[in-house]
Amino acid sequence: MSRFKVSKFRHMEARPSRREAWISDIRAVTTPTCGNHIKSSCSLIAFNSDRPGVLGVISLEGHEENKRHVTYLGCHSDLVTDLDFSPFDDFLLASGSADRTIKLWRLSGTGEALPSVPGVVLGPEELPVEVLQFHPTVDGVLVSTAGKTVKVWDVAKQQPLTELEAHKDLVQSAVWSRDGAIVGTACKDKQLRIFDPRARTQASQSTQAHENNRDIRLAWTGIQEHLVSTGFNQMREREAKLWDTRLFSSALASVTLDTSPGPLIPLLDPDSGLLVLAGKGENQLYCYEVTPQQPALSPVTQCILENVLRGAALVPRRALAVMSCEVLQVLQLSDTAIIPISHHVPRKAVEFHEDLFPDTAGSVPASDAHMWWAGDNQQVQKVSLNPARRPHPCFTSSLVPTMEPAPDMVQPAEMPRADTDLSEGFSSPSSLMSPSTPSSLGPSLSSTSGIGTSPSQRSLQSLLGPSSKFRHTQGSLLHRDSHITNLKGLNLTTPGESDGFCANRLRVAVPLLSSGGQVAVLELQKPGRLPDTALPTLQNGTAVMDLVWDPFDPHRLAVAGEDARIRLWRVPPGGLENVLTTPETVLTGHTEKIYSLRFHPLAADVLASSSYDLTVRIWDLQTGAERLKLQGHQDQIFSLAWSPDGKQLATVCKDGHVRVYEPRSSPLPLQEGPGPEGGRGARIVWVCDGGCLLVSGFDSRSERQLQLYIADALAQGPSALLGLDVAPSTLLPSYDPDTGLVLLTGKGDTRVFLYEVLPEAPFFLECNSFTSPDPHKGFVLLPKTECDIQDVEFARCLRLRQTSLEPVAFRLPRVRKEFFQDDVFPDTAVTWEPALSAKAWFEGANGQPRLLSLQPPGMTPVSQAPREVPARRAPSSAQYLEEKSDQQKKEELLNAMVAKLGNREDPLPQDSFEGVDEDEWD
């Protein structure tokens, strides 16, 4: 632009919309990622919610008669780092995550259910995915970054076309040029690089971008050779630079803003050349006009925001209100709302202005991935934004097929009410199988899932695959009044084989760091702040290795010591009031320190212990004698677990084997199979009514993983593998046999994974995880009787922090809570009453636990509840008006105006005035 030529945007105004147009009642969160946290197509908005791995989805266009409601899409098992809509298909969304995968989702229109499984999964990568972007001219191509790696994907084949090399540090930005021929990247090594991915994997050009390596972002202008970068200089000032790839040694122009720490998000509209700079954590937007011809970054306007900005996105140009001269619309993501910010150029005439709205790229791709990779450079056909001439082609990408529900799905009376969730909707991510999972495992629903399906539901499941009815699980901390606070001197260095603390329905036992192996006993019925004085303890005289409560006697605690002894303590019914130094019983027999203790699930006074002497010993607590000794381990025993019927005992060992024993039959293992490869630790638990074994451990790359075994076929190896994440602590599984859910977390973690475990494919159904703001030191599951059944609380846990003990409730959102949810709460086993004595069990007897109904008095099961008849909705006034002709609308408008003016035959006020004589005018 010549310096004597004025800009057509010089009078542009940026105004946040009225509160009525805000999308309120959301909960957003900012994560330390390179993404913008919000994206928009011409139909939908997607944004990061405050739940890890969950995106909020809402319609872009609001309707006056209906308030827009946010639906939630459970995408990943970890934070969503970036997301992008297809430039051609408004309902095709790609999401990248810290779980190292990229997923493509076929979203639906307003009011329709979101998918529960992705249409396409790319990866997993070696590191978390940081950035992704669809190709601007081709359907089925996208670029992504993970660590130092940049890949260009053929989505249809689910394979990378190429991998761009030469990056020496974390890649913070990767963007396509407008014609889709080249890719620009910004790296933490301060370098900007230009790639032609179809020609070579090495960068064709590179230059130093900014002097500081913090959060460098890129955006291409409408001219292929020019791009904009944002970052920080050596003085930690935020700056934006304009680059020409033909003269890449230095920037053409630059502008410096301030020293605010929030990284700048560059939002550039290539058609108008307008650049909006939005700072995370700030309350101001800067708008510049990019003029490469001069060259310059010319300031146009600024906008003060009412709320702090957490993310920002541009609304596509085809969705702007062109008749009101809206040249730009920014969506501001705040903590509790999405706020549209319109940029208008004031004009007198209400008409389409060609100078403000040149033709823009349409919604039909120019080619496909195969043609583009072969060298095709066709460009997307441009379309006019003039409403009178604007075409309305509807392109639907074939990458993810659309879901066409069966006709009977639209009949509400046909749908069962037992598994109905909240109307706002919430979709759960699918479980990702490890690459080593057998390929023959096809998706199918287990009969144990407890979901009654109609033919219409089965036809939908054939498209989406199975999903858990617990996928909408909501975990939350209970009120602070139920917390135990002011904990001091906790022992946080208990062995990895121990849970760190133990709890029953009455009290909690926590090892302390003080000498003498002291254990504090806290009463759950007495929450609040503990006194600053020393607590009464159980003094073991040696370091505590593990501890566990007797399931049939809530006052008896078993403690394993480093001195190879097991001490049994009796806690008074009112709680521990004095220091106890003498245990009720001491069990001796192991020759090395003990690692794990497990009480028998059905027989009273039967205890199993594992030791570093490579044996498992089973004790009769009535006589205080060792009765059985199991052998066959070649290395440290990581974990042991009784089967639900108490007949067998399983172990996982550092020698890389899983073993199953029948203790009363033989001291040697009945079965043996391969276990986790890593030797850092493992846990084992019986699942699926004792038909399967679940082992949590590590692979050879130190990735935490789950292995599911058929209990009768250990030698065949695991039936399924599930890789989770990379972390140092072993995942501690807590299994709920009533729901089939396993809760997994590690010491020092902030997240609790939830999976429904099935004995057949797909074996693992992922549910919403629970995330806490700070790490916990332990996490244990309480008995089912502690749950609030009327609030559909199916699990309650205790979370041990460094200074407090907090209860966590896991609930399932349901619409009709006035009914007993019998599909969620089957009859539960009475685990606090023994089924037989120790003597009977050692003599070969077996027992079964008594079952107890959890149905509260006076509540009707939801399976017997009357079905709701959907109310017929009357057509809205807007629909009624659309059916009228223009002439009818005109007549109604005139009649309404006349009715307001009153009767036209009434005399006018001036008719009653007295006139003047003619001669008075002179």
Swiss-Prot record:
Gene Ontology molecular function terms on file: actin binding
Residue segments, region Disordered: 419-467, 858-922
Record location of the Glycyl lysine isopeptide (Lys-Gly) (interchain with G-Cter in ubiquitin) cross-link: K469
Keyword terms of this UniProt record: Actin-binding, Cytoplasm, Cytoplasmic vesicle, Golgi apparatus, Isopeptide bond, Membrane, Phosphoprotein, Protein transport, Repeat, Transport, Ubl conjugation, WD repeat
A Gene Ontology BP annotation from the UniProt entry: Golgi to endosome transport
WD repeat ranges, renumbered to this chain: 75-115, 124-163, 166-205, 209-253, 539-581, 589-629, 632-671, 725-765
SMART domains (alphabetical): DUF1899, DUF1900, WD40
InterPro entries, A to Z: Coronin, DUF1899, G-protein_beta_WD-40_rep, Quinoprotein_ADH-like_sf, WD40/YVTN_repeat-like_dom_sf, WD40_repeat_CS, WD40_rpt
PROSITE patterns tied to this protein: WD_REPEATS_1, WD_REPEATS_2, WD_REPEATS_REGION
Cellular location(s): Golgi apparatus membrane; Golgi apparatus, trans-Golgi network; Cytoplasmic vesicle; Cytoplasm, Cytosol
Composition-biased stretches (Basic and acidic residues): 881-893
GO cellular component terms given for this protein: cytoplasmic vesicle; cytosol; Golgi apparatus; Golgi membrane; membrane; trans-Golgi network
Residues modified as Phosphoserine: S459, S462, S912
Tissues with expression: In the adult, widely expressed with highest levels in brain, thymus and kidney and low levels in skeletal and heart muscle. Not expressed in lung. In the eye, strongly expressed in the outer plexiform layer of the retina. In the intestine, expressed both in terminally differentiated epithelial cells and in crypt epithelium. In the embryo, strongest expression is seen in brain, thymus, intestine, apical epidermal layers of the skin and developing lens fibers of the eye.
Biased composition (Low complexity): 427-456
Post-translational modification: The membrane-associated form is phosphorylated on tyrosine residues.
Membership in a protein family: Belongs to the WD repeat coronin family.
Quaternary structure, from the entry: Interacts with clathrin adapter AP1 complex. This interaction takes place at Golgi membranes and not AP1-positive endosomal membranes. Interacts (when ubiquitinated at Lys-469) with EPS15.
Biological role: F-actin regulator involved in anterograde Golgi to endosome transport: upon ubiquitination via 'Lys-33'-linked ubiquitin chains by the BCR(KLHL20) E3 ubiquitin ligase complex, interacts with EPS15 and localizes to the trans-Golgi network, where it promotes actin polymerization, thereby facilitating post-Golgi trafficking. May play a role in the maintenance of the Golgi apparatus morphology.
Protein name per UniProt: Coronin-7
Species per Swiss-Prot/TrEMBL record: Mus musculus
Gene: Coro7
